[in-house]
Amino acid sequence: MTRWLALLLFGCALAWCGASRAQTCTATPSNLDFGNVNPIAGTAVARTGTINITCNWTLISLQPNALVCLNLSTATTRAMANGASTMQYGLFQDAGNTQTWGSTVSGNTPISVSIAKPLIGTAGNATVNYYGQITAGQTTVPTTGNASTVYSQSFNAETVLAYGYYLLTAPSCASLSSAGSFPFTVSATVTNNCNISATNLSFGTAGLIGAGINATSSLSVTCTNNDAWRISINGGGSGNVAARVMQRTGGGGSVNYQLYTDSARTLAWGDGTGGTTRATGTGTGLAQGVTVYGRVPSQTTPRPGSYGDTVTATIEF
């Protein structure tokens, strides 16, 4: 009887050792996609990712708690890339984007969570958030090929999963050894965008129109860096880009005029029809000034009064 009992206890001891080695934790993060990003807006863009964590216990365990530490190394300021172009961002542990997600190796704080063994079953789960924010003010981030451009950064070896099981007092993250990785990718799609504004063009006051009258105004164009743009100006009230007309306020007269893309006033600015051309350029991510050259040609002087026209500038990109 005694011999049988000794064998039974020895068998249980072997079973306990094997089960102890089966206690493991895993971490599965979601990729973080910032979606479409308009760099010329110059604003920060924030998104949230999740990490699903599962810890397993033996059926009978003297360590009913597990501390899981998610280490992320590399620089505090991170950068997504497309070729040689980059876009800076940060990864954080809090929604306020103040606590950087780091690693014990680099002296920063990893994301950590404690999970308790459930009363029923042997697997405990937890979900934690991580937060990303694209740094504001990166207005010169370019696109390529005049198309939306994906920037990304992948994490693999930079991620270190560490965990430890305990009874009452949790170990420190720094004391735990690496037990694997949790790869994920951060990405954003930089889109082409343009903003345009205009100042009015005034030919001033004239008694007679015996000679041509010149004047200029300007457009301010801000387009995504490396994105080609093209500006058309419609025919205004006449509806004819090749023969623009200012009308007298109250009626009873008109003045012919034209707009040009060049200072010599040889290239009429329109929509590409009727012998007209359009202004073209490439965005820099910063405001670009585009001059509008106007001329009232010599013509029969109309009735005195105030003459004007309204035209619309349209930018394509």
PLM regions: where:
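Positively charged n-region of N-terminal signal peptides that target proteins for export
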Residues: 1-4
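A surface-exposed loop-and-adjacent beta-strand signature within N-terminal beta-sandwich domains
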Residues: 76-124
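Beta-strand-rich interaction surfaces with strong enrichment in secreted/lumenal proteins
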Residues: 114-120, 277-282, 298
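Outer membrane beta-barrel transmembrane domains
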Residues: 260-262, 267, 272-277
